[in-house]
Amino acid sequence: MPFKMIAQDVNKDKLSPLNVECTHAKCDDQLHSYRQKPKNKKIILQEDFWATPAQKKGSCWACGIDLVDWPRVHNKDLSDVIYTFNMMNTELVRYVYWHTSIDQKAINHVLRKGKLQLHFAAENRLRRCVAKPENYREGYQTPKQGNIIFYAQHATACRCRKCMEYWHNIPMGIQLSDPQINYFVELIMLYATARMPQLQENGIKVPPIRNNGRLFVNGLT
């Protein structure tokens, strides 16, 4: 993934999950990227923009701003989660996932599940896809849309081990503990209920999506 500065003339609210990465920044809108920039990594910049020559760990690789109280975020304190979410909204990719429209398939899917089944599904996905210390698909194990859990993982920086490392201070080379998994499940649930306040404890019946007179249910016709 190239480190890229999004052009100033691009409306931040027109960006979608399909065209942003955790290595992208839009500093003119105060939306940054805190991903550590490897040496000699290719960077795509605007013509009038110069990246900072040396990145302080935890600062934006593009403009050098250091906004986040990282020890506070790394405490993983759910009673202080509003601060964590506010700071995540200063990073471009997280901002997009907190504000983008959720696709209808994902909406229908989670309404059918309800909170109780969603909680179970979130834990199951974390254990299968990101709990292990090594994954040959590291960085690509979480799709960008189609399920509210995917949106939540990107929004709360638990979609891959690299994001977990710099946002939550969990080294890549260790197995996630049960308390860590439980913390991420709670972040996912908080995201889901914030984005979909109509979500009920138990699932509800939702009509299948119609497209040109044909019924689409979970991608099947």
What are these regions (language model features)?
Residues D69-W70, Y166:
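Short, non-ligating residues that shape and space the ligands of small metal-coordination modules
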Residues N75-N86, Q175-P179:
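Short cysteine/histidine-rich metal-coordination sites, predominantly Zn2+-binding motifs
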Residues P133-Q175:
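Amphipathic protein-protein interaction modules
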Residues L15-T23, T52-S59, Q153-T156:
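Short metal-coordination and nucleic-acid-contact micro-motifs, chiefly zinc-binding Cys/His arrays
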Residues I6-L15, N40-P53, G139-Y151:
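Short, intrinsically disordered, charge-biased short linear motifs at domain edges
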Residues K26, L31, G64-L67:
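Cys/His-rich microdomains that often coordinate metals
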Residues C22-A25, C60-C63, C163:
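Short cysteine-rich clusters marking metal-coordination/redox-active sites
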Residues D178-R214:
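Long, highly charged low-complexity segments enriched in Glu/Asp and Lys/Arg with interspersed Ser/Thr
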